[in-house]
A protein has these predicted regions:
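Predominantly the C-terminal beta-signal and adjacent terminal strand-loop region
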Residues: 166-186
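Short, charged, amphipathic alpha-helical segments
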Residues: 104-117, 142, 175-182
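Membrane-active amphipathic alpha-helices enriched in small hydrophobic residues
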Residues: 78-92, 113-128, 147-162, 182-198
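Sec-dependent signal peptide recognition
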Residues: 9-17
């Protein structure tokens, strides 16, 4: 005489509950906490009614979103350091040109494109990354890092146009000074932003 597992339906249900309980408990932990403190650009892209949500674009689960976020931010950090190094080299070329070595003009122009492209790729990885697991309103190194990103992003957008303006401007010295000042502020904000990523708070 065979024994059917249905005779032990209470046991079967108990096993199901034990199996599902960790999954049920883990789900709320993966939900975005304190959404009201989410950065504006993240809300616009990944909020409940964000652009990517409307397109049904991206990973299907929060767990996969968080994995993608980690990968994107890791690559963002690597490219950001490369961008910082390239910008330092660009600044060096610029100061040498200011001293009269115009033989570096071609290198300065070529590396400006490489630097700009690397920076924008790095910035895109950060701005387009899925939301974090938790947000808060306290001051932290990462929040200052984000504020500084607005400064050096604006600088990187402006520097190429200010460089071209040197050639066409009626006041060469003034145009050159403006270009260098914006480039210096951009480099300083990027450097400080990079340092903040290594702080534990």
């Amino acid at each position: 005489m065979g024994i059917h597992f249905s005779e032990f339906s209470p046991l079967k249900h108990f096993i199901y509950i034990l199996f599902l309980l960790p999954l049920i408990q883990a789900q709320p932990e993966l939900e975005i906490q304190n959404k009201e403190h989410m950065p504006l650009h993240t809300k616009l892209l990944w909020g409940d009614n964000g652009f990517f949500r409307q397109l049904n674009f991206g990973p299907k689960t929060r767990k996969d979103e968080l994995k993608l976020r980690v990968k994107m931010l890791q690559n963002h950090q690597k490219l950001a350091l490369v961008s910082l190094g390239l910008l330092a080299y660009q600044s060096s070329l610029g100061y040498q040109m200011k001293e009269g070595d115009y033989s570096l003009r071609k290198n300065h122009r070529q590396f400006s494109k490489i630097t700009w492209g690397t920076y924008m790729t790095s910035a895109s990885l950060s701005y387009f990354a899925p939301p974090a697991q938790k947000y808060d309103n306290r001051l932290s190194s990462m929040k200052i890092h984000r504020w500084l990103s607005y400064v050096h992003f604006a600088g990187m957008m402006a520097v190429p146009f200010l460089g071209k303006n040197i050639v066409t401007s009626d006041n060469y010295d003034e145009a050159l000074a403006l270009h260098q000042n914006v480039a210096t502020i951009t480099f300083a904000s990027m450097s400080l932003s990079a340092i903040l990523t290594f702080l534990p708070y």
